[in-house]
């Protein structure tokens, strides 16, 4: 009897922990005023606040911390001219004012610089990786430098065209992640909204050695996996679904990537917690068995546009420990009110919709910003890029 009571008590205790962790955080307003005079409120869990760490940028995108502790960030400039991209160094962070005192151009004149990464090899040499639309580059990195001291090495080339935009078409971005297995992963989006591609590299994640050798397909059927993050021994990715199935379908998704898996595009798509056939390409299942498509860890509302993701292995008050934060860039159709926020996802979730963690970028039809990437600085502290306002926010405990 005593053993039974102990078991019941333990079960109740564990249940309370699970329930406590699953309660969505209560969000409180924080007033933000930008240099141009725009003033609005961003909503965060009540124990956090936000400040402007850097502003005056353009299409500021993805971040990485260098081996010497500085923050590097990409800036794609704008949608009309994709040849003026820049990589900046954010330096001399003022902890009192929560701002970077220096924003230094590191590389300029780049074609859609979206993603960067650093790696220190087994010989102690530091390397800087840069993903452009048409090329993956690597530079020997010297700590403390403000300009590259070495020539770029071209590790891979990619298609540089598409069916939509004037300067290269659909899905111009390439995103990098480096694993603890000393492999590099890079995502290449589709050339179209929905089609059967002529080039195998499209809608894939490619794995290669850190010097570019031994390239192979790691995963397929990912229409536009803009966010990549290696966590411990696994690769995670966000993915944007197609636009031709209406306002309610398909779900935008986040996956723990399985080596060799096909995630369905253009033949299958996820909506809610189920995978369906795209009737325009796979009406009878003749092209692909959609039952073989892995279910997502997170299934966001259609057209939310998930981009960057970051994992928090610990948190001072358990609101972030064991969770991802995912930046939902937002639908271009504002009336849908999809995205324009940061959401929280448990690491082992199954088709989770996400819990609101940071909101206020879309307010009564007015867009104040579009979240892109999240970089963890400390257990409850992170930087967030916004490519609409050209701002980098610092979020931290009060």
Question: Language-model features: where?
Answer:
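Beta-propeller domains
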Residues: 72-99, 144
